[in-house]
Amino acid sequence: QFDAAALKAATPLGKGLGASPGAACGKVVFTAEDAEEWNARGEKVVLVRLETSPEDITGMKASQGILTVRGGMTSHAAVVARGMGTCCVSGCGDIAMDEENKKFTLAGKEFHEGDYISIDGTTGNIYDGAIKTVDATIAGEFGRVMAWADKYRTLKVRTNADTPADAKKARELGAEGIGLCRTEHMFFEEDRIAAFREMICSDTVEEREAALEKILPYQQGDFEALYEALEGNPVTIRFLDPPLHEFVPTEEADIEKLANAQGKSVETIKNIIASLHEFNPMMGHRGCRLAVTYPEIAKMQTKAVIRAAINVQKKHADWTVKPEIMIPLVCEVKELKFVKKVVVETADAEIAAAGVNLEYEVGTMIEIPRAALTADEIATEADFFCFGTNDLTQMTFGFSRDDAGKFLNAYYDTKIFENDPFAKLDQNGVGKLMETAIKLGKPVNPKLHVGICGEHGGDPSSVEFCHKIGLDYVSCSPFRVPIARLAAAQAAISNK
């Protein structure tokens, strides 16, 4: 947090959305690579981007704070920053960005690479220069209040975590499992992105499988580390979700490197990259649609999940390691049936080959309205439902979470909306779809367990709604776990 006296003396230059709380001060950098490089030599940096994407992960980790021109409360930058406990201000549309020349203008002032800037992830305020920061503290009463909360709540609280470090932090803050592990973030590490790009640019199934075989040990290692961190608590692993264009290189040097590795011309690689372009990627070739087109991806991920679980279970006989495999973006039961068949055949073969007993579950995310409306059909094939309320909100409202920031302020000013539907669950519309899905799904499959893993899982009023409609758990960013625990207790008491 900022030093109170220093903050009082400062005047904000501009304002975005307070997307991830905290305070950050550092030198401006414009690329993830620069953030890593500067951080490695001991510089504190603030990463400034038009918007972030999964390939920026390593640079985001190296930054004190993140500032984006585009995006709302559930944009990539906001969600990832909250998960890492990194300060983030998103959607500051007043910034005029000049990425090519590594500079931007805000309130008439020009900022260049290396200039100091301070951002407040709670208020969304942006300041010129360096403001002194002090470490945030947790008072001794925290543990006592949390113990009271745990005594009364009936909702379980899990976390959204992709790394053992995030999982460990969430466990310290009281999380009872992982409700969402986004496997795509694991592909961006330096040693595996090359193999994944090789897979994308392959011409045949055999070539794709050979590239995926290189990634398998890395992915398996990631899952083993997560299972170790969770000590037998549940881990829900979402299979590959983003469209493939997010993984391909954009820099000329990286394209040449990929062409050389593939033994293809730069022109051919550029054509492959161009072919991945989509007009609306959010509703394009992503989620389970990737697993239908390329079942070999789902096979590789299943092998990694199951092998990791078997290894960790063998090491810790007193733990119950029961993988939960989550298929994203399902809108039709036959889709789930198709992907589930691939998963089950692969998993059962792995378990048989190892000569062990291992239980696992296959469930789905409910993030498309049609999935909620046909939940009675989908429940016949799913062991669990998890509401991905970030996508369910944008699909229900029909506006993109990354573009909504441009007009939502006008909606608040004119009182069309009272709240940001991406931050506070829309109970009348999105909530009604959730209720419908539960009412349709549970009678068909009484063992169905249901959770939520959108950012709403850390919002108190949304948590109360989840309690009311009978969810089993909420899952949120690690640093929001205490809020969810408290909100779940308040919901239990007020709804007695």
What are these regions (language model features)?
Residues 138, 148-496:
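Conserved alpha/beta-domain cores
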Residues 1-35, 39-44, 49-176, 180-181, ...:
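Acidic, glycine-rich flexible loop/linker segments
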